């Protein structure tokens, strides 16, 4: 049996993730108390279900504390067990709840939204370390759907997948980054008005950055560092290693370098390249992500 556990903060997109799994053929169960996991899995196994997706979150109350132990128990019941933890920055979660006017499950007359988010983050801290974390702070719902599908495809294979992720420091460092490189010291195409509308994937920006030797040295230095330490990360039984490349706005330099690194590692490894901030102007932080 294949089991995917979904957890994370309220408003981070758990309902979207669960619906993606349901759409691709998983039997989906939402808001299950953690203590009932073994019983449910045993029953579904007896009735012939081969793929199951279960959402477990803070609404489970005190039973949530049992989840780490239940995960260990489920490894004995499932041939393939994965856990996805969805996260987002506090300001993003506050904006999503404010825009949709949904109530946070831990908020009350005496507990503000910000306090409720912090309480939930504290309660889920140990669970966040159990699985693959996805920071949805800058993700549109359609992008999250694509990332979940990528995760399912990658996890079905053996070995480590290397993800290069560009971002803008002005929007915050991605919560799911394992390694972070700051490339704001490089020449900035933003100050050339002709280049400003483009991204680091467009030829005019590529030619601009290619003309500076320090850009090539930065790319090579990052490549060498990742290549040197990649075997150590792989020995840690990881499925993913997320390398985040940041510039000021996440549109030009970081995109260029993430693409460069992706090309140079793709001959020998499974590689994904993602750009968090390059299309930020079309990102919707509100209604479609504030699920519950």
From Swiss-Prot:
<feature type="binding site">
    <location>
        <begin position="8"/>
        <end position="15"/>
    </location>
    <ligand>
        <name>ATP</name>
    </ligand>
</feature>
<dbReference type="Pfam" id="PF22740">
    <property type="entry name" value="PapZ_C"/>
</dbReference>
<dbReference type="InterPro" id="IPR027417">
    <property type="entry name" value="P-loop_NTPase"/>
</dbReference>
<keyword id="KW-0342">GTP-binding</keyword>
<dbReference type="InterPro" id="IPR053931">
    <property type="entry name" value="RapZ_C"/>
</dbReference>
<dbReference type="Pfam" id="PF03668">
    <property type="entry name" value="RapZ-like_N"/>
</dbReference>
<comment type="similarity">
    <text>Belongs to the RapZ-like family.</text>
</comment>
<dbReference type="InterPro" id="IPR005337">
    <property type="entry name" value="RapZ-like"/>
</dbReference>
<dbReference type="GO" id="GO:0005524">
    <property type="term" value="F:ATP binding"/>
</dbReference>
<dbReference type="InterPro" id="IPR053930">
    <property type="entry name" value="RapZ-like_N"/>
</dbReference>
<keyword id="KW-0067">ATP-binding</keyword>
<protein>
    <recommendedName>
        <fullName>Nucleotide-binding protein AZOSEA20610</fullName>
    </recommendedName>
</protein>
<keyword id="KW-0547">Nucleotide-binding</keyword>
<comment type="function">
    <text>Displays ATPase and GTPase activities.</text>
</comment>
<dbReference type="GO" id="GO:0005525">
    <property type="term" value="F:GTP binding"/>
</dbReference>
<feature type="binding site">
    <location>
        <begin position="57"/>
        <end position="60"/>
    </location>
    <ligand>
        <name>GTP</name>
    </ligand>
</feature>
